[in-house]
Amino acid sequence: KGKNFYDMLMVKDGNKEIIFAKDYIASLKVHRFAYDNIVRHLTEDNESSSTISPSLGLVESFDYLDGSKGTLKYKDQNNNYIVYDKASDIFKGKDARLYGTVVYPGTTFRGTPVEIQAGVAIWRDGHYELSVNPQLGSNYDDGGVWTGLDGPKDNTPDVSNTGFYIRKFVSEGAGASA
């Protein structure tokens, strides 16, 4: 359903719901929105991305389908961090428009998984310890992702510092970020 929301805004061919559309042709008229906001490791021939990093407030403004507020559930009733099996599990049950608006951990863009992860939770002595690595694209001892290619990372240009990328109005088409 989230993909349908994205397609409603981005796919013009055969879409009877398009109200305003403007075509851009590289040799005649261009814009830089996709260029400046594409997911970091999916840039084509540029070094720019993540000009707009959606905030947690925006993500949490999308309520859950059961009618509850959109606040992400990251701690249990005992104030312990919840460790999810998959990065996308924390977003389960959210309004599908979130997917059409924001690239968040555990999703894809252009059919490619995005790597948004800031560390790992390690089970030791009956509790989880959180471990981070400042190196983008790093792997933990077990071969899994430690810190994703796409961040988040503070104070680094062209990398999301919030853990989210904008999806809405960023074209998935080849050459859109060139």
Residue spans for each PLM region:
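An aromatic- and glycine-enriched ligand-binding surface/loop that stacks and positions planar moieties
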Residues: 1-148
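Active-site beta-strand/loop architecture of penicillin-binding DD-peptidases
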Residues: 138, 144-178
